[in-house]
Amino acid sequence: MPGMAASSRIFEHLEWPEGYQVHLLEWDEPRPKEGLLDYAARIAQQITAHNPILIGVSLGGVLMQEVARLLPSYRCVVLISSVASPQELPSWMRRCKKLKLHHILPLARMIRFDFWKHTKRYKKLYIHYIGLSSPTYLAWCARELLDWEGKPLDKDKIIHIHGDKDLVFPIRYIGDCIRVKGGTHIMIVNRFRWFREHFLPIINSKISPTEEPTHTPM
């Protein structure tokens, strides 16, 4: 699952060997009064395999954790540039949550990928990878992220990959994770060579070689 306002094209540089069935997911406009848990239930209905590896970037990682609760046979959840609990949110987000400012202020503008537009190079990336970005959807994302309760999953079934230069979710707030030196919040795109080299070995380290082929929604 891609991050907020991104499309599944962010995964286009990942290479999967035979035995992996990849199912790319996209954000859909949230329904009226639909919360994150109900949204996760809709996404879970799209996943038919009984042993999926769930991969999510940024807010997509938060969503995949909620999807995992609905799919008891999930193999593992892979978080990329994301948070494993509300305690890993930066302090300013936690303060906004405590004061409920996210219900009255346009916080989506502070969380989205606007920094992609700062150079011509990243502006082109922004245009290529942008997905659903309606004002209603962006406001919903900000609200649901800060309202997220985030009950912990089995730590043995979590893989957390995080860049030490992430400005959206700074590394100092992140707990146990695999650190990517120089990795930013968009490292799935601009550090794709690192992922090509390390991503599959990291996943395979969690999976027994005798297990059957893997379905990978992301």
Which residues fall in each region the model found?
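Gly/Ala-rich beta-loop-alpha elbow adjacent to hydrolase catalytic centers
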Residues: 55-64
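Short beta-strand/loop motif that positions the catalytic acidic residue
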Residues: 160-162, 166
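Alpha-helical membrane-targeting segments
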Residues: 36, 85-124, 128
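Short glycine-rich catalytic loops that host catalytic nucleophiles or stabilize transition states
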Residues: 25-27, 173, 178-183, 188-192
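Active-site catalytic motif of lipid deacylating hydrolases and related acyltransferases
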Residues: 1-50, 96-104, 184
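Hydrophobic, aromatic-rich cap/lid helix
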Residues: 121-155
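Flexible "cap/lid" loop of the alpha/beta hydrolase fold
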Residues: 69-106, 154, 212-213
